[in-house]
């Protein structure tokens, strides 16, 4: 999906949004990912380049509910564009605006770094949110998976074989 380089406002709501600036913020992001997908709690440290995060070519934006990280948006930058690398929301915070808060807050704050626009690949579950934030489908993505429960397949828009 593609979003032209125009201004976006941070979404109002019950969540505070902040850019990850400490290693403890990355640990909070890892917990969101682990909650969302049942992965290892140290996933961020193993998958994302911490050197790139420290250098600023990767940004991590957190939507916070009290002391609890609810959603995370990872943004990458290059050639005047921003790529939405990954979005995750803890299941207990879904359908409350956490993902909208994290993504809109990150995009609003990074506008000067990405005047050309933003792009992402959307799952069927995330596409309605991205459309509401001004992203347009360039070409539909067809997910191919092996296995999974009926519920998991439905979440990504795949049909059982």
Positions of the model-derived regions?
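Conserved acetyl-CoA-binding loop-helix of GNAT-fold acetyltransferases
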Residues: 86-91, 95-110, 132
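An amphipathic alpha-helix signature
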Residues: 26-31
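Helix-loop element at the rim of GNAT/NAT acetyltransferase active sites that forms part
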Residues: 32-43
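Conserved active-site alpha-helix within GNAT-family acetyltransferase domains
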Residues: 100, 124-140, 147
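Actinobacteria-biased recognition of intrinsically disordered, low-complexity terminal regions
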Residues: 153-161
């Amino acid at each position: 999906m593609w979003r032209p380089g125009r201004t976006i406002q941070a979404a109002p709501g019950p969540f505070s949004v902040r850019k990850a600036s400490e290693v403890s913020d990355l640990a909070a992001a890892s917990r969101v990912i682990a909650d969302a997908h049942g992965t290892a709690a140290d996933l961020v440290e193993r998958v994302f380049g911490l050197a790139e995060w420290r250098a600023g070519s990767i940004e991590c934006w957190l939507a916070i509910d009290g002391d609890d990280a609810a959603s995370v948006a990872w943004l990458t930058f290059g050639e005047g564009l921003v790529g939405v690398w990954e979005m995750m929301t803890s299941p207990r915070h879904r359908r409350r605006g956490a993902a909208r808060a994290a993504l809109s807050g990150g995009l609003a704050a990074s506008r000067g770094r990405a005047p050309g626009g933003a792009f992402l690949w959307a799952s069927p579950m995330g596409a309605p949110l991205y459309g509401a934030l001004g992203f347009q489908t360039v070409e539909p993505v067809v997910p191919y998976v092996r296995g999974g429960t009926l519920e998991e397949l439905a979440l990504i828009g795949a049909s059982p074989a």
